[in-house]
């Protein structure tokens, strides 16, 4: 589903005249929970297929995706075993690893890493590679900032 949606977003943007470097002028992706988080690496992958280099693809996607958190319960934030994702979406794992490397290069706090303890933390990917992060209420946003991303 995520791949189909990402392909449609790119096709519609191109049909409207986007060169994809300006994708944020043509599309916004609202990630309303952690299960659609895979749109981030999938959009990056598709942009790379179109000839856009990884760093620029990451920058483009970071201007297109925004994340809303609907809960403050840690157990509701999806975490997927690397071993599962390597089988289910092997084409996305190198991208997820690169995103994690970028986070590790700029953030010392291990609790915010995308890959930790053999798991891929979807909310962390959304937070680090989206242009906006918010909760459904001001209190949710503040708790999210303090407990998950430590700002």
Task: Give short role names for the model-derived ranges.
Residues 1-31, 38:
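Function-dense linear segments that define catalytic or interfacial modules
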Residues 5, 42-46, 60, 129:
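Short, hydrophobic/aromatic alpha-helical segments in well-folded domains
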Residues 149-151:
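Conserved small/polar residues in nucleotide/adenosyl-binding loops
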Residues 30-32, 60, 128, 133-136:
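Generic beta-strand/beta-sheet core signal
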Residues 84-87, 91-134:
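Polar, glycine-rich mid-to-C-terminal structural blocks
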Residues 46-97, 101:
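Extended, well-ordered alpha-helical scaffold/bundle regions in very large, multi-domain proteins
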Residues 30-42, 64-68:
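Core structural elements
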Residues 1, 34-36, 71, 103, ...:
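Short, glycine-/Ser/Thr-/acidic-enriched flexible segments
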